[in-house]
Amino acid sequence: MLRTALTTRRCSAGLLAGLLLAGCQPGPSGSSSATPAPATPSASPSPALAATAPGLTPPQRLRLLAGTITAAPADRTIDLPYSYLHTQSWTRATNVITRSDLQRWRRDADYSGREVTRRLPDVRGLAHRPTSDERRQFAAAGTKTTRYVSGDLEPYLPEPLPTDPAELASALAPYELAGEPAYPRMLVHGVIGVATSQYLDRAQRAATLRVLADVPTIGYQGERTDLAGRTGLGFTVSADNSQTQLIIHPSTGEVLSAHEQVHGAKPGLFSYVLILERGHTTTDTRTLSGRP
């Protein structure tokens, strides 16, 4: 399940941080079925135009995007009791790739909720490339429902998420590790972790973009299209024997997908995740389209 994969990844990041900290000196502190309201008109220039203008560095593009992003439809429904998330993910597990479709409803008041998971058979080997055909297969897969009592479905980071970029970066990865080769990877893992675990409002999305702008080795690829056919702005982070690609919505600043390939002794796919839907609902049985 995606929750398990995220928990494992978070624990792995924590272990890595602990091992690295032991060898370095501390540094300075550094919706329901209701029709969503229309998005707020964007400022001029548009986010996409500002971020894709020629001659800009990747950090400049991300900061421009952070300063000009528009409201997402679900920003207007945050008063509803449940945060809803729908993802599809391909994740390395030793020598196989697991394939999962996850729908999650979290009651924000007490962190109770429900998850519905569909799984496809694991794929042996690490050279697997996710395909659109696999996405269609999820619809016919069996479902597993898991219910969580109060306190059992915690978000990646405690709410409310910081909107100060320095504070958010410190929550995602210890500042003391800023000089370590793994630090950029830890930061981008943290950004993916919050994007695939909890709803980010406009200010919080802007903060994550500013965190990415400060990630060493950040690169820009231009427009890219993910496995769900959505086009966004492609950014990459290369660090610690891996390369991670993020595709970001050019108007709202939402992370649409994340794809990590690792190199070294066991090269291949590490993870690929599509964030298909995110928003808020009145119950833990409704989706944004209104279908259960």
Question: What annotation goes with each model-predicted range?
Answer:
Residues M1-L16:
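N-terminal export and membrane-targeting signals
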Residues L20-G23:
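C-terminal motif of bacterial Sec signal peptides marking the signal peptidase cleavage site
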Residues Q25-P292:
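Intrinsically disordered, low-complexity prosegments and terminal tails associated
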